[in-house]
């Protein structure tokens, strides 16, 4: 789905399909869609991976170049180990600090992170199963904005009152955010399981001494 198709979907849900008398412009709906895409990205970001060089003797990495970064899930260093050697890390602004493992020696590391989803004229990175969810959030924002504008005006046209639009929009946003919270919890559990630090069981046959 591209942006034009998403706008059409949102218009359909809003019953705003009379091209001679649109209640919302394409620009307005695009703004609401982008807001919904941003919120989806916070709960369920686009999985991404980057290869960055470390600096010998330093545990700090500049991650400002990670495009549209929403979060960092894991840091693998050194790369190529089996199982993967994930390290503990901390982030302050655009600076990531590797907190565990051997001192970096200038070799590469892998950064697994979540990025903002893309929805533009060319296409989308949003999974098909979440397109209706994004449309629902955009509808909620559009309805609330229109209701806030029209609620104190008399002749706004249409058969639905501004108050009804406000209630409908608030319910759409409530359902949208509730589903985002559910998806966010599930995604955190998945990330925790996928990128857990490798801690092999202690040997029962080797004596490590007192």
Model regions: which residues?
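Glycine-enriched, solvent-exposed interface loops adjoining structured elements
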Residues: 1-210
